[in-house]
Structures are given as C-alpha cells and as structure tokens.
Amino acid sequence: MRTRLFQWVITALFVCATVWVVSCSTDDNAIIDPVDGPGAAYRAVLQGLDWGPDTTFVYGHKTPDVDAVCSSLGYARLMRALGYNCKAKISSPINRETEFIAQRFGFDVPELKTAVAAGTRLILTDHTDYAQCVDGAREAKILQKIDHHVEGDIKDSGIPYVRREMIGATCTIIYECYNELGVAIDDETAKILLSGLLSDTRNLTKTTTQHEDSVAWTALVGQLKLENEVAEINRLMAEAANNYDGMSDSAIFVSDYKDYDMGGKAIGIGSLECKADEADDFVSRMLAVMPAVLRDNKRDMLFAKIDVEVPNPDQGDPDTPYVDDGLYFIYYGEGAQAVAEAIFGPSLRPGVTYTKEHLSRKQIVPKIMEILQ
C-alpha cells in the first residue's frame, strides 16, 4: 500500500500581488519558466513560506545513509534553482557507501554541522523523528519535510509543506519534485538522485520498491547512459556498505542506525548484514556490544536487524553474488524481549529472534510503534 500526503499552506497564496524571491546562486540547475500546471500550486506554496534573511539548511537524518545525504543535496539544489537560499548539511559523518559513490560519481558531500541555533530554518529529508534530527531542531523553524516513512513525532500538522510517500527512496520523491516544478535535472544532480535510489532500493530489488522508483530509475539511468554499468555500481555500493574492515564492533552496530521515541520509550534500531557462514559469530558480537550502545545512546531498548546473505543460486548473475535469506532480529533492554517476540515469535536464544521474511527497518518500525503505543 502506498500513501501520499500533501499538506499545503492556504494563506491567500494565489492572490499575492508581489512575489518575494530570496536571492542566491542558481548555478546548479537551470530553471524552466513557470507555467500553469501541476507544479503551479507547489510553487505558490514555496513562495509563501517564511524563508527569512538567512540560509535555510536541508538535513537528512543522523548517521546518514546514501538516501539521506543525496536527498538533502538534491532538494537543496532544487530550492536554489527556484531562487531560495538553501544549503545541504549533514549532522554526523557519512558512511562508507556514501563515501564510495560520491567518489565514483564525483560529487561533493555536504559539510558537517552538528547543531543549529534556535530559529534556524530547516528542511528535513528522509526522516520524521526528532531523535534523528540535527541537534537544535526542536527550537528551529521547520519549513518542509520530504520523506518516505510513517509519520514520527515531527507531526505533519505543524509544518507548512509536507510530502510523504511510502515508496522506496526519498530521492525518488525529489526526482518527482523536479519534474512537477519544471526544473531540469542536470547530470550531476541525476547522479546524486540515482545514488540514493540505488542504495535505498538496492537497485529496485527491495520489497519497499514501488512503481515510482522504477520510473525514476529508468529516467536517471537513461539520462546518464549507465544501462550497462548500473548493476556493477550497485554491487560495489553494497560491498562498500558491508565493509566493516578496521571497525570496532560498537562502530559496526551504529554504522546504519536510527533513534526513535515511541510510546514514551527511547528506542534505537540498527540495520546490518552478514554472510550465512559468519552469522552465529556476528550475532554474538553484536549482542555483546548492545549494553554499551544502549548506554552511550541513552536508549531504553535497543534492536538490530541482521540480514543473512547466501550465495546467489543464479550463477549467471555475477553482479549479484549474494541474496538475502532471512534475518535475525536481536534485542536488549527492559521490555525489548516482549516487543521482539510479539513481532517475530519465540527467541532462538536470549536476545535473538529470527524470520525468513525479507523486511526493511522501515517495515519493522510501524510494528514496534503499534506495540508500544
């Protein structure tokens, strides 16, 4: 099921005699002259926002994955193309997959800015929970939210423009925004958006992938003429994402990790992968660091899904050497066992449940929310 939510500010936007445009550089994209059509109301909403005199920062979530980084980059470029003074930032360092694809495609990642002052204007991409926001977000002024998750504690009703679609990647939504607003996607922006799309859908193979993702994939791959390379690029991205060489077990646990506040509980959820022949040892290592991770991140409960990979039985697909074959869902903290077992059944051993289902974190989070709330 796919849900699309558009919340639009209705404040005499269509009867304004004067249009206020904030000056800034528009070097990144060429804007097509606005015309009547589906994007007209969208443009009117943007024109009516309280942009203020300072830079509006566009942030993905903390511990950013590729989609978080690239959706913030892509949307900041779009806003600048329309004349709004926006700049992408990251609130914590990028992961190895983002580092790889940025080097491969030759784009710069946003600068690190770990906190913002009260009143700072923000646009959020790829998250909808304060626990995942840049520090200071509660006292900031959130102008927009572009996301593909269920509504978190940053409520849609308090934000002037919200676009939330239950599809595979936030970068797909950003692609749609460019088209609706009539802004041409240059090749560098196409690479940025494709990066997030490939990562969050794993080249359209994840169960969360929707038709909209396929449409964006086809257009971006075609524009960049990557039809013969995209499978290899995706494979190399996956290898970079799962490269834990030189990392401590605690660092591995939080390499793809998100915080949530649900039902009065502070929750942390990691997302990891391991080979089937290494699963027992890997699961035990992750269990061993959970007490410290819970303490360091000030959580009440801690979970992680660990996807188990097996050799691809399709010998003719060299770009997909491994495929997922179930997942372990591990837990720690008071009440965590009851939550995990309510979703996945009895524990295999203390701290460990298992399912043959292919589930993303995005699909597991609503199940936890339902139990706790």
Can you name each region flagged by the protein language model?
Residues 20-23:
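C-terminal motif of bacterial Sec signal peptides marking the signal peptidase cleavage site
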Residues 1-10:
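Bacterial N-terminal signal peptides that target proteins for export
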Residues 25-30:
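Bacterial lipoprotein signal-peptidase II cleavage site
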